Amino acid sequence: MKLDEIARLAGVSRTTASYVINGKAKQYRVSDKTVEKVMAVVREHNYHPNAVAAGLRAGRTRSIGLVIPDLENTSYTRIANYLERQARQRGYQLLIACSEDQPDNEMRCIEHLLQRQVDAIIVSTSLPPEHPFYQRWANDPFPIVALDRALDREHFTSVVGADQDDAEMLAEELRKFPAETVLYLGALPELSVSFLREQGFRTAWKDDPREVNFLYANSYEREAAAQLFEKWLETHPMPQALFTTSFALLQGVMDVTLRRDGKLPSDLAIATFGDHELLDFLQCPVLAVAQRHRDVAERVLEIVLASLDEPRKPKPGLTRIRRNLYRRGILSRS
């Protein structure tokens, strides 16, 4: 049923019916009797106004796009969960897309969200810093906010973890273990987040004489880490200390080790980005740093909504949020 039909059945003009349905009856001095006539028809025919159409007329769809690289990454899904809940409470719908850490996929996701006329976009980019894709919005008021992986700080605002500081803290803790063989397992070294985590690790390890083997997977996916680690084990012994730059990479290592040996060595010291309570069941020492997911989501949404309320482009810059350190495995029981 359309608004014209509601007006006809209530015996009022289309404009008056619109005022009543959109809660503007008092503002335009529509009588209580007329309001009741219109609302009686609305209730009888279970009429619901088209929110999308109303938003488009106002230049808004009350929708926000979110592009993340991996839906299996629990850190991203937790942040997405908080974002969706908080956006919904504020009357916005969150449209989620996954780039699978592929630049071409990410660019298509962005284009599709723009075709849906979202009011803003939140993105955890898989594009290298020098890529020109986002520069078209460098001087555009359309709000694009970077999550977890920073965009050009001169033109965009980013909310990220303190990757370098967190990696340095984590590596300092790992250094306390008497391991002789050390493996650093990262991925996609061309990404700023990967570079910063490696820099933090190297800073912590610079005065340590123990040699570190550096491995880089071609994606942050569990399967990519498993394939790389399995091949590496063909020519190397199991390391005594392991540093992984994401939880999915650690899962790949665990998959290979469990298939091969049936368990993780009890003397393997693990340090990882990402956390899960199930790590407490391991018999080896585990150090994990985890994002403060709620804090990250609240800060990102605060920036987005402020830019929509003004409206104005978010102020360029970088907000770093430190991660929490957790002691898991046998460390949780000591």
UniProtKB/Swiss-Prot annotation:
Q: Does the keyword Phosphoprotein apply?
A: no
All copies of domain HTH lacI-type, residue ranges? 1-58
Query: Without the gene, what phenotype results?
Result: Decreases expression of genes encoding virulence proteins. Decreases virulence in mouse.
Which molecular function term from Gene Ontology is one that the record holds?
DNA-binding transcription factor activity
- The Swiss-Prot or TrEMBL record marks DNA binding at 3-22
All disulfide bonds of the chain are none
Function statement: Global transcriptional regulator, which plays an important role in the regulation of carbon metabolism.
What's the protein name? Catabolite repressor/activator
The organism encoding this protein is: Salmonella typhimurium (strain LT2 / SGSC1412 / ATCC 700720)
Gene giving rise to this polypeptide: cra
